[in-house]
């Protein structure tokens, strides 16, 4: 059952990532990997919220919710591999400052998003 929930969640998360990334690139252009950055920040925020909510607020079989939402949906939604290749491509193109900015913003804002999500989750 857990494998099926992970499969379904991951598929939905991947479709959501595709939609959000493409919307960001459409609105803001592709000079900076904003689509991946926004996806990873919002995914980190949701991870914090849902992690606390599932652990502290839900009763019953929390493993099912964890499999569907945390491992499945957010695993399919967030993307370290896209972040990595986009940063590599920036470096290879000689855009060292933009690559460094991408790394700094991604790490700092994703950690901040997870922290904020935990705070929000505790208030629910």
From Swiss-Prot:
Catalysis: reaction(s): fluoride(in) = fluoride(out)
UniProt record similarity statement: Belongs to the fluoride channel Fluc/FEX (TC 1.A.43) family.
Lineage: Bacteria, Pseudomonadati, Pseudomonadota, Gammaproteobacteria, Legionellales
Spans traversing the lipid bilayer: 3-23, 34-54, 68-88, 100-120
Broad class of where this protein is predominantly found: membrane
Swiss-Prot/TrEMBL keywords: Cell inner membrane, Cell membrane, Ion channel, Ion transport, Membrane, Metal-binding, Sodium, Transmembrane, Transmembrane helix, Transport
Keyword Ion transport: yes
Gene Ontology MF terms in the entry: fluoride channel activity; metal ion binding
Identification of the protein by name: Fluoride-specific ion channel FluC
Bilayer disposition of the protein: Multi-pass membrane protein
Gene source species: Coxiella burnetii (strain CbuK_Q154) (Coxiella burnetii (strain Q154))
Superkingdom per UniProt: Bacteria
Role, per record: Fluoride-specific ion channel. Important for reducing fluoride concentration in the cell, thus reducing its toxicity.
Cellular component aspect of the GO annotation: plasma membrane
């Amino acid at each position: 059952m857990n494998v099926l929930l992970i499969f379904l969640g991951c598929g939905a998360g991947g479709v959501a990532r595709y939609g959000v990334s493409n919307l960001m690139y459409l609105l803001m252009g592709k000079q900076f990997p904003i689509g991946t950055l926004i996806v990873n920040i919002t995914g980190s925020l949701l991870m914090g919220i849902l992690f606390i909510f599932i652990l502290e607020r839900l009763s019953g079989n929390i493993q099912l919710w964890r499999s569907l939402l945390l491992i499945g949906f957010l695993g399919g939604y967030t993307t370290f591999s896209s972040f990595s290749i986009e940063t590599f491509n920036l470096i290879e193109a000689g855009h060292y400052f933009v690559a460094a900015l991408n790394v700094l913003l991604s790490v700092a804002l994703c950690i901040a998003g997870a922290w904020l999500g935990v705070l929000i989750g505790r208030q629910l």
